[in-house]
């Protein structure tokens, strides 16, 4: 209901072949048309797998959006953020779950040496809280990356749709990265819904 005429930036930090980006663009265009608004949509994505990255980039080129293909980056979102100074209107992802991100962690200086501002938050007068999760599963870090790219000064703000398995709801003890990410979301009142899907 809040889609007004204007420019919207859509981001997927685990974009694969770009399918979710394409569906998001088509959905926004349809909603804008139904409301009689004129929108310009720019897609941004990052993919670590060279083959799926190439498919995504080629798909955007084939759609005739040559410059837009420059907005698809090839590297790990966790250790090599392709869009460090960007904020986005809409963000979505289906990141890998249960997949180790130890290589990224080592590349970033390890748990004690990492200084990436995407993965550290401050709560009131408390010392900084680390959002670094256990190295065996980095899915919540993809969400923390998106939270760091939210627009906070516009009326619409940002909207995030993120696909997870159930472990994101309960892993990590109090004070650990997973718990700190959930706390950050709840204390900022960013959560609108959790939708559980059936198996298969």
Task: Show the residue positions of the predicted features.
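Short amphipathic alpha-helical segments, especially helix-boundary/capping motifs
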Residues: 29-36, 116-123, 155-160, 187-190
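Surface-exposed acidic, glycine/proline-enriched linker/cap segments
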Residues: 59, 113-132
């Amino acid at each position: 209901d809040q889609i007004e005429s204007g420019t919207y930036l859509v981001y997927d930090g685990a974009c694969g072949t770009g399918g979710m980006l394409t569906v998001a663009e088509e959905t926004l265009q349809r909603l804008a048309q139904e409301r009689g608004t004129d929108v310009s949509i720019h897609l941004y994505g990052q993919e670590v797998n060279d083959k799926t990255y190439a498919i995504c980039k080629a798909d955007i080129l084939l759609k005739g959006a040559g410059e837009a293909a420059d907005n698809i980056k090839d590297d790990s979102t966790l250790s090599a953020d392709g869009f460090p100074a960007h904020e986005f209107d809409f963000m979505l992802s289906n990141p890998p779950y249960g997949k180790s991100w130890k290589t990224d962690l080592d590349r970033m200086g390890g748990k004690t040496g990492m200084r990436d501002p995407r993965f550290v938050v401050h709560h009131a007068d408390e010392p900084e809280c680390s959002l670094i999760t256990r190295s065996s599963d980095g899915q919540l870090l993809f969400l923390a990356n998106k939270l760091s790219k939210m627009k906070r000064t516009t009326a619409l703000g940002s909207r995030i749709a993120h696909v997870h398995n159930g472990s994101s709801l309960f892993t990590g003890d109090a004070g650990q990265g997973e718990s700190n990410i959930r706390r950050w979301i709840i204390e900022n009142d960013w959560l609108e819904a959790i939708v559980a899907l059936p198996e298969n």
